[in-house]
């Protein structure tokens, strides 16, 4: 894993996309009675530090473990498994050939649920090398197919895709 990691280390992603999907994640926490969480691709983690009136861990009811290979402070994967693993605005940044490894890692850390929010349109951000920050742009059916290849059948999985340009969304539950 890591074709673009050095590129992302030069950028400053704060983690604010999580706020769009907190409602979905909170429903999964309640449904599964989750007691531990992992934010896979947390960015700089500012969403957990009280950002004005916004404070994600208060909304979630707990502080998640944080992982982001592009941020030095969070580049080490937390040990153990978690009831829930969520990843928002991350998968589209991973090259297609590296997705199997990433999905296997995500599912290996989850005991009850996985939530993926994935953008399906080009990013407004450009990497330092000039490439668009979203390198894997596919529709929800494609994502559902690849996720199903790596998803254990006992892990409740929700996929939300969205297009940031036309504000369209799709939602799939894989039970």
What does each of the following model-derived ranges do?
Residues 84-90:
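A short beta-strand submotif of the Rossmann-like class I SAM-dependent methyltransferase core
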Residues 112-115:
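Short glycine-centered segments of the SAM/dcSAM-binding site in methyltransferase folds
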Residues 125:
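N-terminal substrate-binding region of glycoside hydrolase catalytic domains
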Residues 1-84, 97-104, 109, 120, ...:
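Conserved N-terminal segment of class I S-adenosyl-L-methionine
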């Amino acid at each position: 894993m890591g074709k673009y990691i050095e590129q992302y280390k030069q950028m400053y992603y704060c983690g604010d996309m999580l706020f769009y999907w907190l409602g979905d994640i909170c429903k999964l926490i309640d449904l599964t009675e989750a007691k531990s969480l992992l934010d896979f691709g947390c960015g700089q983690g500012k969403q957990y530090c009280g950002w004005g009136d916004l404070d994600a861990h208060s909304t979630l009811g707990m502080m998640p473990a944080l992982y982001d290979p592009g941020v030095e402070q969070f580049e080490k994967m937390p040990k153990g498994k978690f009831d829930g693993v969520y990843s928002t605005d991350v998968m589209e940044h991973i090259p297609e050939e590296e997705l199997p490894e990433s999905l296997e890692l995500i599912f290996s850390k989850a005991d009850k649920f996985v939530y993926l929010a994935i953008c399906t349109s080009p990013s407004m951000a450009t990497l330092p090398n000039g490439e668009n920050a979203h390198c894997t742009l596919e529709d929800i059916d494609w994502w559902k197919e690849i996720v199903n290849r790596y998803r254990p059948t006992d892990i409740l999985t929700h996929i939300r895709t969205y297009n940031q340009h036309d504000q369209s969304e799709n939602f799939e539950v894989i039970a």
